[in-house]
Amino acid sequence: MPTITSYFGFLLASLIFTLALFIGSSKIRLL
C-alpha cells in the first residue's frame, strides 16, 4: 500500500511541476 501511495504522490508532484513549468514558460513568452 505505501508503495502505491508514494508512486501516486510522485506522479502528482511531477504533474504539478510540469504544469508550473509550462505556465512559467508561457508567461516568459508573453513578456
UniProtKB/Swiss-Prot annotation:
Major localization listed first in the record, in broad terms: plastid
Any one of the GO CC terms: cytochrome b6f complex
SUPFAM superfamilies: PetL subunit of the cytochrome b6f complex
Transmembrane feature ranges: 4-24
Keywords: Chloroplast, Electron transport, Membrane, Photosynthesis, Plastid, Thylakoid, Transmembrane, Transmembrane helix, Transport
Keyword Zinc-finger attached: no
Membrane topology category: Single-pass membrane protein
Gene Ontology terms describing biological process: photosynthesis
Record flagged with keyword DNA damage: no
InterPro entries cross-referenced by the UniProt entry: Cyt_b6/f_cplx_su6
Pfam families: PetL (PF05115)
Gene Ontology molecular function terms on file: electron transporter, transferring electrons within cytochrome b6/f complex of photosystem II activity
Subcellular localization: Plastid, Chloroplast thylakoid membrane
Family under the similarity heading: Belongs to the PetL family.
Subunit field text: The 4 large subunits of the cytochrome b6-f complex are cytochrome b6, subunit IV (17 kDa polypeptide, PetD), cytochrome f and the Rieske protein, while the 4 small subunits are PetG, PetL, PetM and PetN. The complex functions as a dimer.
Cited function: Component of the cytochrome b6-f complex, which mediates electron transfer between photosystem II (PSII) and photosystem I (PSI), cyclic electron flow around PSI, and state transitions. PetL is important for photoautotrophic growth as well as for electron transfer efficiency and stability of the cytochrome b6-f complex.
Protein name: Cytochrome b6-f complex subunit 6
Gene source species: Cycas taitungensis
Biological classification of the source: Eukaryota, Viridiplantae, Streptophyta, Embryophyta, Tracheophyta
Gene assigned in the entry: petL
